[in-house]
Amino acid sequence: MISITSAEVGMKINEWHRHIQKFNVTDAEMLKAEIERDIEVMEEDQDLLIYYQLMAFRHKIMLEYTLPSDENRMELSEYLNKIEGHKKKLDNMRAYYYNFFRGMYEFRNGEYTRAITYYKKAERKIPTISDKIEKAEFYFKLSEVYYHMKMTHISMHYAELSYNIYKKHELYSVRRIQCHFVIAGNYDDLENHEKALPHLQEALKGAELLKSKNTHIYATAFFNLGNCYHKMDNLNKAARYIEQALVQYRKINSDVLPQAYHDLALIYFKQGKKEQAMDCFRKGIRSAVDFKDELFMNLFEALDVLYIRNGDTPKLLNIFSRLENGKGYPYLEELALLGGNLFDYNGKIEDSIICFKKMVYAQKQISKGECMYEI
């Protein structure tokens, strides 16, 4: 049997990583299988095996993003357990990858402050990383988690760093589109929707070129435009874009379906289109149950309280309490604002004040998140 050097396998793992970064699932899967065959006949090298396990972990994160399933989530945990046993042996590069990929794992699980903790540890190793694309990937991931934590200016800083690298590399179109999403989302959080729109329109233009091979990003481009118009109170345009997003998300049975149905139901309720709202409401609850999405089960329950049962304050407060966690605070902020405005419109001033106080509480918890990771 012909032996192969660990250096040769290491080069293949680097190439595998490039396919993962580009979301080239088929090429990544083929190269992974080839590397696993090579490892069977490779000279013994424990460091290389750790590198392989790290990249296999990153590969699973990619699959869980593009093809969400309980099986992929379970395998992620298995890879993590294997890598944990080798932590003391990690050199600078592998320590960087370990903390970076672990941050991605925590982010996918909605543990945003834990994700930031690992990302900051990885950032200390960034000076040892010479590859520009690797740096762009890292900056993008930081921009993403800070966006979810509503740390807007920090997110914008990292998104700009990432985009300025990716725009010089034609092959990384998915990441360029995603940078536009994050930048636009930050502008929306700053209530500067007019600046968000050009980024979202540019993202849709790029996503249209990828629609045959990346339905998810194409759907998300419509969805984000719909959300922006929703924030601008242009409900007709918002509904049209989210309807188009739903068509695409249904094709791939995306785990974003509960959110898309929820947002469209909310828009229809605001427009007084009760029949369409109830249709989205029912479909959304079914999809939330199918995906075991507890967050959106709670948010659909809130829609029921606010728009179907015409306000049940104790029940709404109970839902608020379920959203008091790192992942839930941004949704709690928006829900409390929605409830406050609705109660105010209906003349329920005391209930409105309760909601607005809860909104301020959520904002404070989000701002505290910046200090919750280790320095």
From Swiss-Prot:
Cellular component, GO, one term: cytoplasm
Protein name, as recorded: Response regulator aspartate phosphatase E
Class in the EC hierarchy, top level: hydrolase
Family: Belongs to the Rap family.
Record's keyword terms, sorted: Coiled coil, Cytoplasm, Hydrolase, Protein phosphatase, Repeat, Sporulation, TPR repeat
TPR repeats: 96-129, 177-210, 219-252, 258-291, 297-330, 333-366
SMART domains, A to Z: TPR
Coiled-coil stretches noted in the UniProt entry, renumbered to this chain: 24-95
UniProt note on regulation of activity: Phosphatase activity is inhibited by the phosphatase regulator PhrE.
E.C. code: 3.1.3.-
Chief localization: cytoplasm
Known function: Involved in the regulation of sporulation. Acts as a phosphatase that specifically dephosphorylates the sporulation initiation phosphotransferase Spo0F and inhibits its activity. Probably plays a dispensable role in the overall context of sporulation initiation.
GO molecular function (one): phosphoprotein phosphatase activity
Pfam families in the record: RapH_N, TPR_12
Compartments where located: Cytoplasm
Source organism of this protein record: Bacillus subtilis (strain 168)
Highest taxon, organism lineage: Bacteria
